[in-house]
Amino acid sequence: MMDALMGIDVGTSSCKLTVFRKDGTVILTDTRKYPVYYPQDGWVEQDPEEWWECICAAVSKMMADDKMKEVNIKGIGIDGQGWSMIPIDKEGRVLCRNPIWMDTRAADL
């Protein structure tokens, strides 16, 4: 088995996943795009459910790849464009989209 690491980047326009050896050699990479919403002037949002769906789809695709048969993931690093609270209900469902770093609705505060 080859030890490897997985990086997950939840960016402004897409999530990017990369599996790489400890020496930095890339084994696999996948990118999934999701939309940015502009519901009002100055409002810029994304849907956390879409982040999650993209991450899950990319991980599933990568783990099914033949290159992963001899890979042992030793660690996962997660990075994002800017973190914020995600309101959920008691069943864990996301209640609303999240403002992202480009949102200016609180600029006057």
Regions found by a protein language model. Name each.
Residues M1-C96:
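N-terminal glycine/serine-rich phosphate-binding loop of ATP-dependent small-molecule kinases
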